[in-house]
Structures are given as C-alpha cells and as structure tokens.
A protein has these predicted regions:
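Soluble, non-transmembrane catalytic domains of enzymes that act on hydrophobic metabolites at membranes
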Residues: 1-4, 253
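Juxtamembrane luminal stem/stalk of type II transmembrane Golgi/ER carbohydrate-processing enzymes
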Residues: 3-22
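Active-site nucleotide-donor binding segment shared across nucleotidyl transfer reactions
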Residues: 39-72
Length: 253
C-alpha cells in the first residue's frame, strides 16, 4: 500500500510495512553504519536530533548498543518536522526507506539493509513536558543536551541522561534486562502485526478516539513514574501532569 508524505520537496511516497516489538535482535554492524549515515545527512541540513530510550541507555551504560536491542531510537522536536520530511529524499538516496509515518507527525520508522531506526517526534504537551503518541517526557531531556562519542561519531544526548534513565526505568536501569519477546508464539506475532496495521490503517473517526484513550492511559503511567521517582529521591522533585490535559494531535502528514 502506497502512502504519501507532503514535503517541501514534493510528495514523498512510501510503502507501509508492519513492524512490531520482538521482531529480531539488531545487527549492530549495520545499525552502526545506518546511524552514521543518518547523522551525516542530518548534519548537512542542520537537523538537530539526539539519542533516545534504548540507544541512549546503551550509550551511557554499555558505551555501545544494547546487545539485546532491536533498533535505534532517535528523537527530534516537532518544530523541526519539515526539515526532517525534506531529509527523507536524501535518506532514500542512501538506501533508507520509510516503513511507517504516523498520521499525527509523531513517529517515523526508517529501514536500511534490514535494520531500522525509530524517529520520535516530540510536541509540547504542557509547561516543561513534551510527548509523542502519549509517551510523555520532561522537556529538559530533549533540549538540554551534551555531546558524547558513540559508534565512531559525536552525538547529542540528554545532559542528565542518567537521571532520565532513573526516571524512565527505575533503580534497576543499570542492570541489563532483555525485555523483548523474541521467541514469542506465532499468534502473539500476529496480534502485534494486527495492532500496528490497525494503528496505521483505521479511518480517522475510529483512530483518533482510540489514540485519545491510549494517550490518557500513558499519561497515567507517566504519573506513576513521577511517584516512583519522588519516592526514590525522598522528596517531591516533580509534580504530576494534571488529569485531562492530554489532547491528541490531529496534524496530518
């Protein structure tokens, strides 16, 4: 199925492909190559991005990719979405293809040589907080950055990366834990495939109410992390996000 992304360089067409957690363990050599190519092209057009989630965790804990990870996680700000969309043409020339691009301009997955990169596009939710697909994060982890050496290049990372990992993963963040069910049963794989197929193919009248409820649930999960972090700190470091503040982004690509 051919889908379209409107860019400043014309209409970018791509074929939607279903991917889901637990597909396979990443090939680190190819992933490293992909990351360095992405950085070179992003630097050429002035696109600012940083390492995120599992890739950031590996960078500060293993100083490498996490051995049991399956992809590269990067993030950009919503303000840079048009620069990123224009970059898709250059990425294609280097062998990358878009696998999925969320209709809310919040997630893009790129694949090259069988290895993929997830690009999380964070928009402002409320004061000091950003989110993509309901996944909230303190804005400082996306904007207050520092440069580190990683995989043969220099990459931006949250200046308080260790603090982010403590907030996101809890006190066990320094202990490697394989979370992906790479040996999942066939029916589990089919259910995962169905979930993501629905995510990208449901009509708007069904998709947006579903994502609104999903986002509200993720904000509740974020507030539980706030409670956990404050308990670890022994004081109130962060306040919870007010109930009812989540509103789904309906910006279309």
């Amino acid at each position: 199925m051919k889908l379209k992304i409107n860019t400043g360089r014309g209409v970018f067409q791509y074929k939607f492909q279903v991917i889901y957690e637990g597909v396979k363990v990443m090939n680190q050599e190819i992933s490293r190559e992909n990351l360095l190519i992405f950085k070179r092209l992003a630097d050429n057009v002035g696109l600012r991005f940083s390492l995120a989630y599992g890739t950031m965790l590996g960078a500060i804990r293993e100083h490498d990719f996490i051995p049991h990870d399956e992809d590269i996680d990067l993030c950009i700000l919503q303000e840079d979405i048009e620069t990123f969309k224009n970059l898709l043409w250059d990425l294609r020339e280097e062998g990358f293809e878009v696998m999925r691009f969320d209709r809310r301009n919040s997630l893009c997955s790129l694949i090259r040589k069988g290895e993929y990169i997830d690009i999380y596009i964070f928009r402002k939710l409320c004061e000091g907080v950003r989110e993509f697909n309901g996944e909230a994060i303190w804005e400082k982890y996306l904007t207050v950055l520092e440069e580190i050496d990683f995989q043969g290049g220099k990459f931006l990372i949250a200046k308080e990366a260790a603090d982010f990992c403590l907030f996101e993963y809890g006190e066990s963040w320094q202990t490697p834990i394989a979370m992906k069910p790479y040996d999942m049963a066939w029916y589990q794989k089919k259910l995962s495939q169905l979930f993501w197929w629905l995510h990208f193919n449901l009509p708007d009248c069904l998709f947006f109410p579903w994502m609104q409820r999903n986002g509200e649930g993720k904000i509740e999960a974020f507030n539980k992390k706030v409670d956990r972090y404050n308990k670890i700190a022994g004081k109130t470091v962060y306040d919870k996000i007010p109930e009812g503040i989540y509103h789904i982004a309906k910006t279309k690509k």
